[in-house]
Amino acid sequence: MSNITMKELLEAGVHFGHQTKRWNPKMKPYIFGARNGIYIIDLQKTVRLFKNAYNFVRENAQAGETMLFVGTKKQAQDAIGEEAVRCGMYFVNQRWLGGMLTNFVTVKQSIDRLKRLDAMFADGSIEAYTKKEALQLEKEREKLEKILGGIKGMGKLPGALFVIDPKNETIAISEAKKLGIPVVAVVDTNCDPDPIDYVIPGNDDAIRAIRLLTSKMADAVIEGSQARDAVLQTGDEEAMEAAAEESGAEA
């Protein structure tokens, strides 16, 4: 299990919240105090709640479910994209399209269009078009890739969302709640924790804090996926042994 230590949290600045004048009173239970007009997050609670979130994400992956990493603010884009790819999951790190979950059938049509364009450029069939047409198709492809590239392989709705800054991703969270999809989120002192199923109190603005927490969630996915693979492999071996015994008995 990938534990998170108080030292890691402190070094990444996870304990720094927002200015005291910019806060959500619902975050009071997660606040240790204030220093120089900045709220300090209670890292003991962060450690405990992080473990709950980690266990859920691991179990979600072990059950064969997928997770969608969401973080469109500039500080989160790289970590969200890179860590999702590292653990073989999906991500949205540019712009959340309204209906990305609640109208997934329509979004999937755009994904299919992107895949067709990719194939045209890969197999050379784009050469059948004029230079002007090919340029227009390339622009369309780039636009679709920017928004949908991170969910190109997502054939169905995810089993969970991991979100950086719920205040910035209200539409994504609202859609997840409508569909009953659990949400894990890094929640800063200016956020409303109520819609979040697994709250991780922490700094959602510092790049190091975002990277640390996102990478740990990716570790949880990897751990769960590996456990699932091990079980499936054991099951396959047992099935093969049973089949071999049956054929031996028949002989």
From Swiss-Prot:
Source species, domain of life: Bacteria
One term of GO molecular function: structural constituent of ribosome
InterPro entries xrefs: Ribosomal_uS2, Ribosomal_uS2_bac/mit/plastid, Ribosomal_uS2_CS, Ribosomal_uS2_flav_dom_sf
Ribonucleoprotein as UniProt keyword: yes
Protein name as it appears in the record: Small ribosomal subunit protein uS2
One Pfam match: Ribosomal_S2
Family from the record: Belongs to the universal ribosomal protein uS2 family.
Stored HAMAP family: Ribosomal_uS2_B
NCBIfam families: rpsB_bact
Presence of the UniProt keyword Nucleotide-binding in the record: no
UniProt entry keywords in alphabetical sequence: Ribonucleoprotein, Ribosomal protein
One GO biological process term: translation
GO cellular component: cytosolic small ribosomal subunit
Organism from which the protein derives: Geobacter sulfurreducens (strain ATCC 51573 / DSM 12127 / PCA)
PANTHER family, sorted: 30S RIBOSOMAL PROTEIN S2 PROKARYOTIC AND ORGANELLAR, SMALL RIBOSOMAL SUBUNIT PROTEIN US2M
